[in-house]
Amino acid sequence: MKKLTLYVFLFLAFFNMALTQSSLPECKGNDIKNPLKKFLKTKKWTNCHGTFLDLKGVTVYSGEFYKGDSHGYGTFTYAGRKYVGQWKNGKQHGQGTYTYVNGDKYVGEWKKGKYYGKGIYTYANGDKYVGDWKKTKYNKPDNQRERNGYGIYTYVNGDRYVGEWKKGLRHGKGTFTHANGKIEEGIWKKNKLVKSKQ
């Protein structure tokens, strides 16, 4: 039941997000060709839709603004990375998709610039995690991105773990099904099965 609820929630959330378009007016003085001039003007942008390019021409945000901050719905790109989704007070907040340079992708809930809540993380190598996240910074190395709560991790080799996670590791009740059919079920601690279900 947990698994079905998780999939239904994620589908509805991202279907609604995909339909989001700004109804706000264009920000006054929007000129992507003049980043310095634009930077000065963004401080005054509020309740409008515009594009901001940083002084180095590397970071681009196109979307809704409120009191000079990205706020509402917008797209952020930086050195090959891209975030599309909701913002609040200059940080990713709500539903959003973050694509990494290496091809990894996170689609899910955000809170104050971090993965927080339900989300799907697809790795460039084909692995996939669907489940809960807690206070995870998007710019941390993979081994520090914290899967927390209940989730399903499917490995590209056919292995699969369904169960509880803590700080990115299998921790709590869970079932690990190997590609060869072997099943390990019981209580896990820091990725190790410590109590097998008989």
Task: Describe each PLM feature range.
Residues N16-Q198:
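Glycine/tyrosine- and acidic-biased, solvent-exposed loop/turn segments at the edges of beta-strands
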Residues L4-F14:
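Sec-dependent N-terminal signal peptides
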